[in-house]
């Protein structure tokens, strides 16, 4: 999926995550994370976001995530929504997403 514009999903409420996805001039995926549980779960959150991007066939993006204790399912849902918005895609392939076994 080609990232065309900046898009945001989520909120800064407790147990949520705000994720911003933008085009990346460096042609790589870069993930910046701000989390109160960085030491315990930072690597896991980054891996989860990265794997979701790979599953969505995103090859280049700048991702900024602010985590407020979100569960894995919330992190994935927010990432999926932000990527679709940033790509200008309004149709979700639920069969494909379901095949990820999340």
Curated annotation (Swiss-Prot):
It is found in: Cytoplasm. Keywords: Cytoplasm, Phosphoprotein. Pfam families: ACP. The keyword Cytoplasm applies. The modification O-(phosphoribosyl dephospho-coenzyme A)serine is found at residue 14. One of its GO terms (cellular component) is cytoplasm. Transmembrane segments: none annotated. Oligomer with a subunit composition of (alpha,beta,gamma)6. NCBIfam families: citD, PRK13253.1. Covalent carrier of the coenzyme of citrate lyase. Belongs to the CitD family. This is Citrate lyase acyl carrier protein. It comes from Streptococcus pyogenes serotype M3 (strain ATCC BAA-595 / MGAS315).
């Amino acid at each position: 999926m080609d990232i065309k514009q900046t898009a945001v999903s989520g909120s800064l409420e407790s147990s949520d995550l705000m994720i911003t996805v933008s085009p990346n001039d460096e042609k790589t995926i870069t993930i910046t994370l701000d989390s109160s549980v960085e030491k315990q779960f930072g690597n896991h959150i980054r891996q989860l976001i990265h794997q979701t991007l790979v599953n969505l066939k995103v090859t280049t993006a700048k991702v900024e995530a602010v985590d407020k204790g979100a569960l894995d399912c919330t992190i994935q849902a927010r990432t999926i929504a932000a990527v679709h918005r940033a790509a200008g895609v309004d149709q979700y392939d639920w069969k494909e997403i379901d095949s990820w076994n999340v």
